[in-house]
């Protein structure tokens, strides 16, 4: 069984569909039952010879007991791949004390971006250790490698994922378990409020297919060739130029939001 969190939208949904295309049984985790039912139906309509299970979990409101119940359900099956995809960011770029929603939003971003990847990984590793086999894919972001003004907490939580996974690689390198970080740049999803795809901003289906093909080949990658090219080039760019790029990106996102409100 292959597990995907945040599995009913964007990259997570695309991961689930592409894993199903490859013939794997899927375990979907998301917060909205209607979307889970719809996604399960869509998968089975295309790939009727696989099994699809799901669990409802809102990671902004999840308790310790909720995590225990979720892990109990997950450990009832053999999990070959865990894709920790669920994530959350601010609605709009903003300096820390002016983030829309204030402390509630900041708490949600921290809870969603850090706790699931940590606790689900810890809860599923024992069965992988027993089999000496398993794959854990943690979806971060290039934002974790860049000091992005007006994305402070989001960027910092993505750095956590990168650091966390690199340590797991050291801890489990001789246990038959693959731990991989995916750090994409822009992907056309609802999270970035930009539906337009391009050579440098692929749609989620193209990204997921490319990313899955990197498992076993790279321990840390952007998951997509044009993203990797950009990421390697960024290493040679002075930070003042990167700051200007981030500022321009923030303005574009704000303009897009304003245009949507005018429609």
Swiss-Prot record:
Gene Ontology biological process terms from the UniProt entry: fatty acid elongation; steroid biosynthetic process
A Pfam entry, by short name: adh_short
Residue numbers annotated as active site: 154 (proton acceptor)
Source organism superkingdom: Eukaryota
InterPro entries, per database record: NAD(P)-bd_dom_sf, Sc_DH/Rdtase_CS, SDR_fam
Gene3D superfamilies the UniProt entry points to: NAD(P)-binding Rossmann-like Domain
Top enzyme category: oxidoreductase
GO cellular component, one term: endoplasmic reticulum
Stored SUPFAM superfamilies: NAD(P)-binding Rossmann-fold domains
Keywords: Lipid biosynthesis, Lipid metabolism, NADP, Oxidoreductase, Steroid biosynthesis
CDD domains to which the protein is assigned, alphabetical: 17beta-HSD1_like_SDR_c
GO MF term list: oxidoreductase activity
EC code(s) of this entry: 1.1.1.-
Similarity comment: family membership: Belongs to the short-chain dehydrogenases/reductases (SDR) family. 17-beta-HSD 3 subfamily.
UniProt protein name: Putative steroid dehydrogenase 4
